[in-house]
Amino acid sequence: MLGRPKFVLASGSPRRLSLLNQAGIEPDALRPADVDETPKRGELPRACANRLARAKADAALKSVQLDDELRGAFILSADTVVAVGRRILPKANLVDEAAQCLRLLSGRNHRVYTAICLVTPREAFRQRLVETRVRFKRLSEDDIQAYIGSGEWRGKAGGYAVQGIAGSFVVKMVGSYSNVVGLPLYETTTLLGGEGFPIRFGWLNATAV
C-alpha cells in the first residue's frame, strides 16, 4: 500500500482486525506474538494488561526487524483483561473455566481493561490503558449451559464475547464498547494519529456498512 507507512498488527485476533478495518485501517501484515499470558502471582489487572501488551510489541518488533519489507513499520499490540475486583479472569478455553467465569460475572459489575502498545518507526514505545465497566444480568444455570453450548466463549477474556450472544447479558456499560471487544478505537486512532500515522488514508476506500 503506497502512500503511507507500513503498519503491522501484533495480533491474530479476528476481532481486533475487524475493528481496525472498521476504522479504515488495514494492516500490511499480522505478527501474532507467542507470549505466555499467565498473570504473575499478585499481579493487578491493569499491570497485567500493560505488561502483556508490551511483551507482544517487543516480540513483534523482533520479527519485523528481520523483514526488509516491514522494517520501520508502525507496530500495534493489545491485551485485554477482564477482572472482578482484583481477580483476573482467564481467557477461557475449557468448559469448566467458562462456567466458572459466567457464574462469577452473573449479576455483578466487572471491569474490562485493554492495554495498547504502539511501536513507532523510530522504535519508541507508546502505551495507553482503557477501562470499561460492565454489569451482567443475573444468569440462570440454563443461560450458562446454553451459552457454553454455543462455543462463543472459547479463547475470550472472561469467557464471553460481548459482540455476540453475550451482548444480551449486559445490563449496563460505562466506557468504550470497542474496548470490551478487544481494541478501543478512539484511543487507538488517537495514538496512531498523534505519532504521525495517516489514519484517514483508507477512509476514501472504506466500504459502507
From Swiss-Prot:
Localization per record: Cytoplasm
GO molecular function: dTTP diphosphatase activity; nucleoside triphosphate diphosphatase activity; UTP diphosphatase activity
Native source organism of the sequence: Bradyrhizobium diazoefficiens (strain JCM 10833 / BCRC 13528 / IAM 13628 / NBRC 14792 / USDA 110)
Protein name in the entry: dTTP/UTP pyrophosphatase
GO terms for biological process, alphabetical: nucleotide metabolic process
Major localization class: cytoplasm
An example Gene Ontology CC term for this record: cytoplasm
Origin superkingdom: Bacteria
Active site feature: D79
